Amino acid sequence: YIEQGNRVLGILGYTEHSRGHAVKVAETAGEILEKLGYNEHTVELAQIAGYMHDMGNCVNRVDHAHSSALMAFQLLREWKFPDEDIAAIVSAIGQHDEQTGTAVDAVSAALILADKTDVRRNRVRNPIKENFDMHDRVNYAAVASSLQVNVEKKVILLEIELDEEICSILDYFE
């Protein structure tokens, strides 16, 4: 489902959403919760949600968070996951899109942070800079980025170096 969604988004001109993105988001979501001291089980829930969060793109980009959550629900039921784990995972997935969702717990917060901080130049598929949309500009402008969790200060910090001739730091936050 992930690769089909990535193909669909490629045809539509969107940034890369392949297994590479899914793995990066899964790893980052897990790392965030691990560093914050959450138990291994909660870390695993965030990793699963991170990996599955965009598979609904194979249905349609519009409302993909909800499609992804419903698809994940079906798969997790088939795999006999406990109901409370399914609920945590699909809730996080369904909440990850900034237009229709919000962080409602640690798993969803970690997923949202991990997804929104995966900014990399190699995610841009559009070769014509003049035709870049906001996502293309932000990703293409990203020279380097790192996400740091400071437990003592209770701060999660994204350090991002942008080529400001391509995109301003304010554009990143739109």
Residue spans for each PLM region:
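Acidic/His-rich, divalent-metal-binding segments that scaffold phosphate/diphosphate chemistry
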Residues: 1-64, 75
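Charged catalytic carboxylate motif
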Residues: 24, 67, 109
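Inter-helical turn/loop segments and adjacent helix faces that build the functional surface
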Residues: 36, 79-83
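Short alpha-helical catalytic segment bearing the HExxH-like zincin motif
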Residues: 46, 50, 67, 93, ...
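Short acidic, glycine/proline-enriched loop segments that cap or flank alpha-helices
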Residues: 60-63, 81, 170
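Post-HEXXH active-site segment of zinc metalloproteases
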Residues: 63-73, 83
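Histidine/acidic-rich helix-loop-helix segments that form or flank divalent-metal centers
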Residues: 82-144
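Terminal helices and disordered tails flanking the catalytic cores of nucleotide-processing hydrolases
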Residues: 121-174
